[in-house]
Curated annotation (Swiss-Prot):
Mg(2+) 2 binds at D112, D115, E283. This is Fructose-1,6-bisphosphatase class 1. The gene is fbp. Mg(2+) 1 binds at E90, D112, L114. Binds 2 magnesium ions per subunit. The lineage of its organism: Bacteria, Pseudomonadati, Pseudomonadota, Gammaproteobacteria, Pseudomonadales.
Amino acid sequence: MSRVTLSRYLIEQTRSNNTPADLRFLIEVVARACKEISHHVSKGALGGVLGSMGTENVQGEVQKKLDVISNDILLEANEWGGHLAGMASEEMDNAYQIPGRYPKGAYLLVFDPLDGSSNIDVNVSVGTIFSVLRCPNEYLSQNETLNENAFLQPGTEQVAAGYAIYGPQTMLILTLGNGVKGFTLDRELGSFVLTHENIQVPATTAEFAINMSNQRHWEAPVQRYVGELLAGETGPLKKNYNMRWIASMVADVHRILTRGGLFMYPRDAREPSKPGKLRLMYEANPMSFIIEQAGGASTNGYERILDIKPESLHQRVSVILGSKEEVERVTAYHKE
């Protein structure tokens, strides 16, 4: 039986699920960009791409060379095809305008070009996270200047989301709103090939991912929940748990997606005015969409991530996602 490439899968989705041709083309272009990013990541020190740029992004985070390279690759790959009305990125203060010499399309692309890039110099898995939204009608005019308001849609409005993980293998995880598929890059073939047909997050788990060094700063519900996990079989949950923390959201969530668990990056007391560390639009929303489509759940502790109405492009949020039963337990603790 012949292998199913990403292109073939998307064509079949167009035939069977009425996936628009423009959306199919957009996903293929993003996938090609991810292949190019994977190539740069894999060269490491040999390609002169490691280290810092000496600049900061809008979040005040030091930009790695590969942050900027990956951002440029995604912009250049997607700006000319006529399928996008605009783009937004972790690495840019404002929305990216499609150059006037190119036609505009019906979609918006939001992305973190290289999640986990602080780990790139130590050869830890990193990745690209992306989200696709429909552009509101009032911004579809060729001459209309796009501003961030076009992007401020709740995660329930996403039409597609995915991430590429650059590890021992390069994989693309994708949802079009009808389940989650996994594609592995066949470097000899030069294509992403369907290798994981119907990814499901196990409902229960014995693993969790959180940065324990921040424990003293967490809110009481998170303190309580993690304390119960650490108590193991002698505690109220009557089960031993293992902790895993890679400090790369793509890597941590990918592990949870494939074998179950709970990923937590809660708000803490050091910056009370900030509701969390991770960005809603291009980290929490796409990952939450994927996790929910795989049978898991995602919350900020008080409400479903996908129901949050964004107020700004780079809005931060507390994130707790993964196996459904555990997410529901943490949510219940927050509501007591």
